[in-house]
Amino acid sequence: MERKEIESLFTRAREIRALVIGDLMLDEYLWGKAERISPEAPVQVVDVTREDLRLGGAGNVVNNLVALGCQVAVCSVIGGDENGSHLRHAFTGKGVDLTGVFEDPLRLTSKKTRVIAANQQIVRIDRESRDEISLEFEEKVLDFIAAEAARFNVILVSDYLKGVLTPRVLEAVCAAGRRLGIPVVVDPKGSDYGKYRGATILTPNRKEAETASRMSIRTEEGLTRAAETLLAGLELDALLITRSEEGMSLFMQDGRTVHIPTVAREVYDVTGAGDTVLSVLSVGLACGLEFGEAARVANVAAGIAVGKLGTSTVSPGEIIAEIGHAHPDSDAKIKNLDALAAIVKAEKTRGKRLVFTNGCFDLLHVGHVKYLQKARTFGDLLVVGLNSDASVRRLKGAERPLIGEAERAHILAALDCVDFVVIFDEDTPLRLIETLQPQVLVKGGDYTPERVVGKEVVESYGGRVELVTFVDGKSTTNIIEKIRTGSIKE
């Protein structure tokens, strides 16, 4: 697909109403340094320096859909415990409809704790219930599906075998999809795929497909036989088998097969990559793409996802930058964080001074340009952290941004003073600053040093903060107001 088609896809994605049904869980990350061996046992001692709580399982699917710009609702059952409260809190500010999330006081909310040192996962600790939800809460889920399914454009089933997706629930979801003409896209688990009969498309990996088909998949012929068995037996429209370094293989009910090669890249972490495939594939189908086109976009997104550490999302801007060919010089400046970190590290060894600034840069104007030109004078490389569309909406309101993240990134990348652009989905650029460790952090003159996010981080290793005065009277807010009131002057 060409750049304009991809950009159009993610513009349409903002109108998509997606329902995620499945197992919600919390992902806890304990980041630290492992420099000692315990005197109690031959194990590493990790000195924890940072802790993160993130949405996991079906929650990571939600995160991906929000990052893609969709309107999202969730249907699940969680515990009425502290982790359940943490999980609900993790949805804050995402604009997600949680009316279909039910709390069972007798149930344990799933939580997975990962301990990471030197960018390597050392151990994972699980706290969860794998029992099926009770009949009472199964009825609540079934009632929600019956009452609400018709208002969605696509239904995503995220099965982690934690008990929410009972046979009755799955039967109801697939039946609703067929009845209403809504794609039902399933990330399956387990060995019995009969429970997914009637879904639109399944996205197992090779090992899962081998287990479900009970057939060896060591050759292309074996892969095809297994896929044909699953397609026919489950009455699917299509089957997308992910094959790690070999890409993906799409098998369709009409007999067509499409093999999609992967893009060679360094793999940091496969955690959550399946959630990214599920999300991007579903958005593509909901927007009217045929299976092959949607799978190709999902394959690109998966390649980006595995280059990140931990459960993470992929933004439209990252996908467009990876696919696009229309403006190769500008494209080369737009990087994901992991790729940029490697570049920055190499440039620093050559003695280059890194300058970092960030912002929404919606409706780029002369004030922005002069600000960025001044920022560039403080060092040798200027990296601009760009708020994603989802981040801008949280910060500025539902009517912003006026220009999508992909276009904003390309406009910034076209400026000679900008060396690299990296899109981030958080409300602040703290994670970018911690990772890139710029020597100079630049913010606008309307800030005081104490209010600058990342000041303590930068100063901790000898860097500094610079405040740049904005051009008087030049702001996106002022421009929007002038347009609304018709007071634009030459």
Swiss-Prot record:
Region (Ribokinase) location? 1-330
Annotated keywords: ATP-binding, Carbohydrate metabolism, Kinase, Multifunctional enzyme, Nucleotide-binding, Nucleotidyltransferase, Transferase
One matching Pfam family = PfkB
Give me any GO biological process, just one.
ADP-L-glycero-beta-D-manno-heptose biosynthetic process
The family database entries (InterPro entries) matched by this protein are listed as: Bifunc_HldE (IPR023030), Cyt_trans-like (IPR004821), PfkB_dom (IPR011611), RfaE_dom_I (IPR011913), RfaE_dom_II (IPR011914), Ribokinase-like (IPR029056), Rossmann-like_a/b/a_fold (IPR014729)
In this chain, ATP is annotated as bound at: N205, R206, K207, E208
Q: What is this protein called?
A: Bifunctional protein HldE
Q: Which source organism does the UniProt entry give?
A: Geotalea uraniireducens (strain Rf4) (Geobacter uraniireducens)
Q: Which gene encodes it?
A: hldE
